[in-house]
Amino acid sequence: CKSMTHIAASHGRSTVLPILAQPRVNSVAPILPAFASFSPRLHARKHPTKMPAKPPFHRRVLHWFDKHGRHDLPWQRGVTPYRVWVSEIMLQQTQVATVIPYFDRFMASFPTVKELAEASEDLVLHHWTGLGYYARARNLHAAAKTLVAEYGGIFPSTVDELASLKGIGRSTAGAIAALSMDVHAPILDGNVKRVLARHNAIAGWPEQTRVRNHLWEIATELTPADRVANYTQAMMDLGATVCTRTKPRCEVCPLADDCKARLQNLISSMPGKKPKKIIPVRETVLFIVFNDAGDVLLEKRPPSGIWGSLYSFPEGDNPKELPRLTAAVTIQAESLRTLEPLRHTFSHFHLDITPVTVQSRPTNAATEPERWLWYPLDGSIEVGLAAPVTKIIKSLSAT
């Protein structure tokens, strides 16, 4: 490199000052490595770590079911549409633990839909005594007759055909199709409603049309194409054992991470409760008429109304109605005694019952024998009994 000079003025004289030669710089590239090593943050980018994708809703439910679901319920052994149907009807409004012994007895007496169809209504109701909601049993019996008469005892495989049978709604039809045939059919029973309402933070009572329709849309969308039977059972189990009405166990729920109700602290308020109504109270007198053999007189109730087609004690508004009863069955009452009253609660009213015992003379015969029955307290006659009748008979047998 050549030397360079610079002339500066100093006290009127010219002075030559030397400038040291510098190497020629043709590019900035050689400088960058040193610059970069000095300040790496200016050119290095941080890439956020990707979180693993959350498994789909149905996969989480099925994974939980495989480990924690219920796999040994009676209707899960030797699965058939008939067994699933009977269990689903019994489980409406009734806990699993209560249903199991009734289901076992029912299957022992009516192992096929044909045998159920051929049974008498009284015998079917006898097997239902104590489960309540007796319209379920009457509808079950009627639907069995239809299945035998119109389908040759073979269950249809479509939800629409199943739902056309008496006493089978959309959700029950879906459960029969899904659980016994693995057909892609969503369900929406009480347990599933609770799980979906909480997971999606859907406010309102689930039986409101708007809310119910929304839940059906979600249930339909989430039901998978594979393992439908397992998924259906899993959703019911999840609602029954984890996402319970009170004290839900969110800490073990496979859906907790994205459950909107949990994240918004709304678990206790979802699903919404049914609007409260004042439950009225009605009063009645039940006449417990004994004959000399110690049997009690029962009357078969009409098919519609409370205790439809069940046997009950003759009923009246007050004890003064006894003459009407004695005229109907041609008995003569000799003594009356009032027992301790009891209350029976229906879904829509309370019934306060005053039992009155009546001792009758031995010469008695009913004018309508198909309507009246002398019932032994040992229960050896198999007919359906109203719940308060069963309770009173048990107390009478114990005395």
Predicted regions and their residues:
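Low-acidity, Ser/Thr- and Arg-rich intrinsically disordered low-complexity segments
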Residues: 1-5, 10-14, 24-27
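N-terminal low-complexity, intrinsically disordered patches enriched in charged
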Residues: 14, 21-22, 139, 318, ...
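Intrinsically disordered, low-complexity proline-rich regions
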Residues: 20, 24, 32-36, 40-43
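Intrinsically disordered, low-complexity, charged terminal extensions of DNA damage-control enzymes
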Residues: 35, 42-71, 76-77, 237-399
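Catalytic cores of DNA base-excision repair glycosylases
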Residues: 55-251, 255-266
